[in-house]
């Protein structure tokens, strides 16, 4: 949540640096105009260092990051890609756009992929799994990675919500073969729109880098119009303005995550007074706390809780009001899912729906104020009709 909250003079300084040195907004070429200023390239290097991975590729969005990741592993029409029922619609859209077949798993009490259901869904056609760290809480990565390795399938981490988080000391996104990130306006760090893909494997990185730029190899010794091409592709290039903002935002990431964790701790002290159950966090998790999620006893109470929070001026972000955009059981508009799961898609994921239908989320700001605590407390008192 806080990325847009902390945009300031640092971002402006990085942008000004572009216009003070030729004003080139395209990430490649025009060397004679830009005085050595390549913001996207600089952002990629700094991000890869931060995530402790050798390769990083900046793209136009988190959705683009997923599509580029799938292009790198060369999806064929019969290939199946497994992902979870609770995720933003873009995860499944990227699979469909890559010509893959989306296979959906249930979630568990982490609100992330259920490892047991993941293994059940693996077939001879399974090419990869995309695990999503929803709202900043890590999935059960040890179990999921072990299963992926056993069956020799690619592990892709959709880390759109988890930038800055860790699992057993490893940055989220760097646990699998490929990690994807989103920098849209609502994420922990933002470039307005934008994304990043990180790799351990040079071959996968090279494929992705070419594919995201119409197949260009971007040989620095050749003018762009004479550059060789290794494949077909599309245009998912990040521009220099986004790269400049990304550099400034990355410097603030640790401060932001620390602030979110501090705010979450204070809100948790309020939630513990009420008859609700907190979302499970796997052992070894260092969450980003994009949002705090808790469960109440039934769906009607969840709606009541949401309404009370909203009436006090406390947002609930995506649970439960934006569930249709974040639950595969609502996506009957996609022919590929309709063909696989039928019209009553929701009934195919009863465990997931049971969790989500009783869940409420509170978005976390790094700028915690005592007034917010009072509002949350008042809303929960009214919800449960009991003063604590």
Ranges and model annotations:
Residues 109-191, 196-203:
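Active-site phosphate-binding strand-loop segment of PLP-dependent enzymes
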Residues 64-123, 128-130, 309:
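Conserved PLP-anchoring active-site segment centered on the Schiff-base-forming lysine
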Residues 215-225, 266-270, 306-360:
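Conserved PLP cofactor-binding pocket of PLP-dependent enzymes
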Residues 1-72, 76, 97-98, 149, ...:
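Conserved PLP-binding active-site segment in aminotransferase class I/II-type PLP enzymes
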Residues 29-30, 35-36, 162-168, 175-291:
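Active-site region of PLP-dependent enzymes
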Residues 208, 303-312, 376-380:
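Short amphipathic alpha-helices in soluble, non-transmembrane regions
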Residues 299-305, 369-374:
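Short, conserved charged micro-motifs
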């Amino acid at each position: 949540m806080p990325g847009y909250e902390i945009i300031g003079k640092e971002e402006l300084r990085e942008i000004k640096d572009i216009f003070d040195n030729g004003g080139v907004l395209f990430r490649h070429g025009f060397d004679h105009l830009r005085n050595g200023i390549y913001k996207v390239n600089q952002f990629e290097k700094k991000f890869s260092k931060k995530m402790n991975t050798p390769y990083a590729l900046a793209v136009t969005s988190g959705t683009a990051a997923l599509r580029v990741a799938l292009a790198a592993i060369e999806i064929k029409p019969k290939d199946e890609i497994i992902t979870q029922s609770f995720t933003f619609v873009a995860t499944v859209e990227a699979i469909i756009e890559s010509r893959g077949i989306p296979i959906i798993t249930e979630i568990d009490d982490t609100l992330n992929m259920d490892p047991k259901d993941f293994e059940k869904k693996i077939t001879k056609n399974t090419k990869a799994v995309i695990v999503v760290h929803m709202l900043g809480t890590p999935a059960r990565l040890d179990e999921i990675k072990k299963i992926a390795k056993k069956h020799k399938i690619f592990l892709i981490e959709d880390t759109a919500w988890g930038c800055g988080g860790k699992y057993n000391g490893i940055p989220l996104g760097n646990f699998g073969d490929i990690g994807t990130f989103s920098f849209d306006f609502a994420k922990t760090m933002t470039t307005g729109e934008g994304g990043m893909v990180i790799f351990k494997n040079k071959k996968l990185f090279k494929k992705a880098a070419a594919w995201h730029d119409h197949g260009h190899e971007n040989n620095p010794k050749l003018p762009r119009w004479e550059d060789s091409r290794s494949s077909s592709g599309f245009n998912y290039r990040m521009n220099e303005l986004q790269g400049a903002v990304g550099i400034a935002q990355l410097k603030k990431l640790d401060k932001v995550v620390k602030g979110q964790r501090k705010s979450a701790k204070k809100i948790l002290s309020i939630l513990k007074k009420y008859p609700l159950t907190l979302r499970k966090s796997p052992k070894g998790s260092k969450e980003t706390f994009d949002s705090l999620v808790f469960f109440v006893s039934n769906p009607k109470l969840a709606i009541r809780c949401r309404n009370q929070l909203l009436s006090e001026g406390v947002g609930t972000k995506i649970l439960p009001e934006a569930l249709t955009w974040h639950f595969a059981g609502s996506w009957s508009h996609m022919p590929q899912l309709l063909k696989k799961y039928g019209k009553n898609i929701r009934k195919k994921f009863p465990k997931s729906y049971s969790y989500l239908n009783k869940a409420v989320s509170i978005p976390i700001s790094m700028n915690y104020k005592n007034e917010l605590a009072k509002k949350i407390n008042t809303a929960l008192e009214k919800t449960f009709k009991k003063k604590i």
